[in-house]
Amino acid sequence: MCGIVGYIGPRDPIDIIISGLHRLEYRGYDSAGVALCPPNGDPLVIVKAKGKVADLEKLLKDAIPSTHTFAAGIGHTRWATHGEPNQVNAHPHVSRNGDFAVVHNGIIENYIALKKKLEQKGYGFASKTDSEVIAHLIEECYEGNLRAAVAAALEQLEGTYGIAVISRRHPDTLVAARKGSPIVVGVCEDETLIASDVSAIINHTKQVIFLDDGDILTASPRSIDITSVRNVPVSRELTHIDWDVGQIEKAGYEHFMLKEIHEQPDSLANSIRGRLLLDEGTTKLSGMQMDSATMARTERITIAACGTSYYAGMVGKYLFEDFAGIPSDIQQAAEFRYRNPIIQPDTCMLAISQSGETADTLAAVREGLTKGAIVLGLCNVVGSTIARE
């Protein structure tokens, strides 16, 4: 899954973006890149690399003198969907005139039709990606207002996106937007950060805002403004993240798998602390909006998850059947909405996602709600999409 990090403020964006991209490496990727915006309107600096973030970091040190300063920057780790994994197809992508740079997570389903229209207007394409059309569309729609140009471009897209945009014409502005792919905003004094996952920016701030689908963020170092695509102001809740950066780093272990295995006892203890009331023989699950009567009439449990969350769900299936005596099954979330699953009236669906933003699991949640299931989300991020829905 791709990763996004962006920064605007007085500090050097390179270090902030690179450290954020390193924290997103666990998600898997095949290439990485950054776009940097000088404060004086000079051309954007684009550096991309096939391979690891460490390879990108070395290229940046070789390409950019230490005396150079930048007002803003965006970075990306790519997992190839359209176009092979190489330096050209890596993000960021740049508009024809070089004024706009874009990083994008998601899939643009109508990119072929958009690409043909742009080619007829004289636009050339360097990459084989769907994402490059966004950069050219922004240039095509630009009439002096960066947010308006991004909004006009987004209205032409079909599919999913989480994007971040910078422009040499607006060195004091960073624009981000989401539809089906997460964007979180880090709220700080005199600077703004954005990312596709809170883990990328948690070492800088624990005060964040999760954008909703259809939101567009316009950020400067000292202000953030969130509107709809149609420029209607919207208000989003400020969320406090109560875990720290140590929980997402390897902490001396050789790899994350080994760390997770050894941390299981502490993780389980932390999970039940304050929730398991031994003296009363019951539990206190304040975050679960499901009353005891609804629980009592649950006749079947369906678990939907992906990856390692799916493996956790496999264990959960045995525990539900062993301790609760409730028939349970486990589903690959990626297949759930395509197989017309049978959801009976008293089915409880448990969706498991570490980030709370896993696209396939979120789609399974929405399918379960449509079919009348009682849906519970199990995730680590309180303000994530699955937690809210």
Residue positions per predicted region:
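Glycine-rich phosphate-binding loops that contact phosphosugars or nucleotide phosphates
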Residues: 296-389
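Conserved short alpha-helical segments that host acidic/polar catalytic motifs at enzyme active sites
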Residues: 1-250, 254-255, 263, 269-299, ...
